[in-house]
Amino acid sequence: MIEIDHVTKSFGDYVAVADADFSIASGEFFSMLGPSGCGKTTTLRMIAGFETPTEGAIRLEGADVSRTPPNKRNVNTVFQHYALFPHMTVWDNVAYGPRSKKLGKGEIRKRVDELLDIVRLTDFAERKPAQLSGGQQQRVALARALVNYPSALLLDEPLGALDLKLRHVMQFELKRIQREVGITFIYVTHDQEEALTMSDRIAVMNAGNVEQIGTPTEIYDRPATVFVASFIGQANLWAGRQTGRANRDYVEVDVLGSTLKARPGETTIEPGGHATLMVRPERIRVSMDAPTGDVAAVRATVSDLTFQGPVVRLSLAAPDDSTVIAHVGPEQDLPLLRPGDDVFVSWAPDASLVLPGADIPTTEDLEEMLDDS
């Protein structure tokens, strides 16, 4: 187990990580996700030993290693640039670590052959790095980092140098390799798809703070803050006020020019308090007629349509001029819509979530965060 015990890291007056407090289980695929400057890489560097906490402690298997040098910690790091030895074969690159530890030849061969089999590079053992694709080079770097059996492997945006299609392939390869070797992987990324695809749990970070830790499903379906909701996936976020409780299970919020029943979040909001209602675009139904049953519904006017393959992305204007985004698939069986058409948009109360506050990041804010990552 790895414990981050109330860790703060400051550089002068700048606080890069503020009171981070969480643990990572042995054998877990744990991701730290967030925009540039959120503190994820600094946290990884403190686990690796490249930075020292200003406050708090880092423990590996119960031992405080906060001031232990990197070479004395049983962890290895894979960076975006793999730093393979160009003059060595794949086999010799992987064997470098065990040789430097002066293991026996038989043990070295056993370990290297085992790792090359796991990363599916046995047939490439005699090639040089320049003869490999980017994905193959990355798997060599993984094998080299794993061959000494570290207690944890730290990965700092290792897929960033690959093209989009290869990144998708390598996401599944990384998860497969992690399951086969059973070693803790701690993965840093600003790419939400990578984190959602591979992780057992995710820590979402923003401005030095850990905003939420949970499984991919928990992070996506029940974000704890407006930032998490806006950063993970696509979400409709409408600012309003919570007026009270509808019943034991739901609250009422004034948004979109209506009072709507919605699922409360984890944070208690007093009646009249600022609130944000979140609904994912894929949870919204669009209909020509007023919906029936226990749903939240408002009138809306089609502003724009974009074909996106399996769905059509509809942008609609609500009565209060707020924008509603809906992803409409063929199962909704709608007639051909055009800008200016009046429709109803609706969703089940369980498909919504009320979050505290009404400070919603703009699209430009999020794009700037990601551009800097």
From Swiss-Prot:
Domain spans labelled ABC transporter: 2-232
One Pfam family recorded for the sequence: TOBE_2
Membrane topology summary: Peripheral membrane protein
EC numbers, comma separated: 7.6.2.11
Keyword Protein biosynthesis: no
Subcellular location: Cell membrane
Keyword Cell membrane carried by entry: yes
Residues engaged in binding ATP: G34, P35, S36, G37, C38, G39, K40, T41
Superkingdom of the organism of origin: Bacteria
Coiled-coil ranges from the UniProt annotation: none
Gene Ontology MF terms: ABC-type putrescine transporter activity; ATP binding; ATP hydrolysis activity
Disulfide cysteine pairs (residue numbers): none
Keywords: ATP-binding, Cell membrane, Membrane, Nucleotide-binding, Translocase, Transport
Cellular compartments per GO CC: ATP-binding cassette (ABC) transporter complex
Catalytic activity field: ATP + H2O + polyamine-[polyamine-binding protein]Side 1 = ADP + phosphate + polyamineSide 2 + [polyamine-binding protein]Side 1
Function description: Part of the ABC transporter complex PotABCD involved in spermidine/putrescine import. Responsible for energy coupling to the transport system.
Family (UniProt): Belongs to the ABC transporter superfamily. Spermidine/putrescine importer (TC 3.A.1.11.1) family.
Quaternary structure and partners: The complex is composed of two ATP-binding proteins (PotA), two transmembrane proteins (PotB and PotC) and a solute-binding protein (PotD).
PANTHER family named among the record's database cross-references: SPERMIDINE/PUTRESCINE IMPORT ATP-BINDING PROTEIN POTA (PTHR42781), SPERMIDINE_PUTRESCINE IMPORT ATP-BINDING PROTEIN POTA (PTHR42781:SF4)
Name this protein carries in UniProt: Spermidine/putrescine import ATP-binding protein PotA
The species this protein was found in: Mycolicibacterium vanbaalenii (strain DSM 7251 / JCM 13017 / BCRC 16820 / KCTC 9966 / NRRL B-24157 / PYR-1)
